[in-house]
């Protein structure tokens, strides 16, 4: 595995740090997000990153808020709270930044988004990684980029297993002009195709392989079922990772299409002593 990844992972055991699981069914969700050297997020002294995790700790009540299958406990939802200027909004901005970079490339103004608490950070890489549960399997995708120089220096996609092992699907060490394909992406016939695409950007610090593999590659995915993990991860980030800001309206109001849910919303608002201007009871 490339050296740039700094996340400590825990395998399933008898401790409370149960992280890995192979889920039954088609669950899709964000498990963890890690970031460093971005806006207010400095590199930790030990070289790690700031982490947002949906992994549940010891739960004694409100168990209906927890998803578990006997191996892993995950929060169905989470809230981030803290003092003013503590970095809450920057966490959302970091997730949104990573999403936009994956889908569209580095956005305007990115060269100034490194953490400025230390002048040395200007030349240090910024780190972004998401762990997701996708179709019963657990993946980590991430990249490192020196924002001030608009240069990606590494990129990776790995499959995570319950025995604390990682199966490399692809890694790129752009600084040393090297890459590695593994797992289903190393399948005979497919690997030769991917070698061409990966080789073209072997030392290109301006491009992410995941984005390239989702541009006009319909024939590849039709011919190689194993290649679809690249399409599916990209599709999850594009279609399922929905990031909203406080001043941004939420477009999906399906929750309110059910009468009982609408009544529940009304009761909650009333409990705060806020009049809706019209009593509602269906």
What are these regions (language model features)?
Residues 89, 93-96, 100, 263-270:
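A broad, structural surface signal
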Residues 140-281:
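Electropositive, glycine-dotted interaction segments
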Residues 35, 40, 130-136, 159-161:
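Short acidic, glycine-rich loop/turn motifs
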Residues 1-27:
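Short, positively charged and aromatic/hydrophobic N-terminal segments
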Residues 66-79, 83, 92-150:
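Conserved P-loop NTP-binding catalytic core
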Residues 48, 135-139, 166:
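Short acidic/polar mixed-charge low-complexity motifs
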Residues 20-97:
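Pre-Walker A-like glycine/lysine-rich segment at the N-terminus of P-loop NTPase domains
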Residues 34, 53-55, 131, 144, ...:
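Residues in well-ordered beta-strands of folded domains
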């Amino acid at each position: 595995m490339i050296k740039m990844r700094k996340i400590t992972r825990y395998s399933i055991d008898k401790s409370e740090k149960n992280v890995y699981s192979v889920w039954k069914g088609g669950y899709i969700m964000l498990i963890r997000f890690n970031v460093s050297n971005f806006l207010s997020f400095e590199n930790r002294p030990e070289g790690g990153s700031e982490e947002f995790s949906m992994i549940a700790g010891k739960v004694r009540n409100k168990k209906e808020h927890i998803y578990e299958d006997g191996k892993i406990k995950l929060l169905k939802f989470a809230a981030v709270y803290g003092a003013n200027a503590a970095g809450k909004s920057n966490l959302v901005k970091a997730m949104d930044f990573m999403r936009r970079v994956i889908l569209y490339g580095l956005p305007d103004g990115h060269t100034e988004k490194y953490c400025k608490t230390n002048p040395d950070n200007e030349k240090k890489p910024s780190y972004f990684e998401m762990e997701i549960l996708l179709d019963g399997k657990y993946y980590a995708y991430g990249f490192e980029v020196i924002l001030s120089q608009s240069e990606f220096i590494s990129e990776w996609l790995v499959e995570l297993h319950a025995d604390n092992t990682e199966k490399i699907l692809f890694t790129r060490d752009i600084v040393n002009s090297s890459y590695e394909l593994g797992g289903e992406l190393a399948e005979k016939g497919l690997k030769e195709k991917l070698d061409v695409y990966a080789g073209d950007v072997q030392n290109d610090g301006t491009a992410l392989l995941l984005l390239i593999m989702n541009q006009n590659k319909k024939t590849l995915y039709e011919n190689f079922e194993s290649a679809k993990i690249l399409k599916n991860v990209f599709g999850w980030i594009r279609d399922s990772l929905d990031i909203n800001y406080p001043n941004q309206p939420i477009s999906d109001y399906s929750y309110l299409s059910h009468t009982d849910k609408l009544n529940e919303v009304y009761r909650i608002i009333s409990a705060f002593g806020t009049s809706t201007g019209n009593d509602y009871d269906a």
